[in-house]
Amino acid sequence: MELVVGRVAKSHGIKGELVVEVRTDEPEDRFAVGSVLRGRKPRESTLKSYTVEAARDHSGRLLLRLEGVSDRGDADALRGTLFVIDSSELEPSDDPDEFYDHELEGLKVVLTDGTEVGSVIEVLHSAAGELLSIRRTGETSGELLIPFVAAIVTSVSIADGVVMIEPPEGLLDPDFGDKSNSDNSNSDND
């Protein structure tokens, strides 16, 4: 399975440097000088190899210089390029509570009483933390976002293909927070 570890956001300067959005927990390894990256444009399948010539942090962003990319025009041509690895290249985690995103995608999500909620379609990474995007099953279809925290996600079994959750009251309610369904008996009508 192909996993994205970075995306070229834009060029930087006139000497061919690239601003890369990092999508890996190990950027110092993936983008080390001398590393060979495989990249492709979105919606294309042909991979091209790029060798990292230089890598540096600049204001919290990763800047890369690749062999053969020597000016702004070359760098602009790579805008949107996705750097990918094959999931078989990943080392297994030593931590039983640590998972790669692709390991969680597709797992069945159930409540602690066994009631099926849906399946994980994506792991979203935000400043506030990770969220599991769940495609609901049953009468209440649609997408559900569940914070990927121990207080809610009680267990994950890759072997069994199950994520068990114990959500707080209202989290699974599709009308939670919808003021149009609230009781209007306290209005100021005289």
Swiss-Prot record:
Record-level GO cellular component terms: cytoplasm; ribosome
Annotated function: An accessory protein needed during the final step in the assembly of 30S ribosomal subunit, possibly for assembly of the head region. Essential for efficient processing of 16S rRNA. May be needed both before and after RbfA during the maturation of 16S rRNA. It has affinity for free ribosomal 30S subunits but not for 70S ribosomes.
Subcellular location: Cytoplasm
The family this protein is said to belong to: Belongs to the RimM family.
Name of the gene: rimM
Assembly with partners or alone: Binds ribosomal protein uS19.
Taxonomy, superkingdom: Bacteria
Free-text note on domains in this protein's UniProt record: The PRC barrel domain binds ribosomal protein uS19.
Protein name: Ribosome maturation factor RimM
Sequence ranges assigned to domain PRC barrel in this UniProt record: 95-171
Gene Ontology annotations of biological process type: ribosomal small subunit biogenesis; rRNA processing
UniProt GO molecular function: ribosome binding
Keywords on record: Chaperone, Cytoplasm, Ribosome biogenesis, rRNA processing
Region (Disordered): 169-190
SUPFAM superfamilies in the cross-refs: PRC-barrel domain, Translation proteins
HAMAP family tied to this protein: Ribosome_mat_RimM
Principal place of residence: cytoplasm
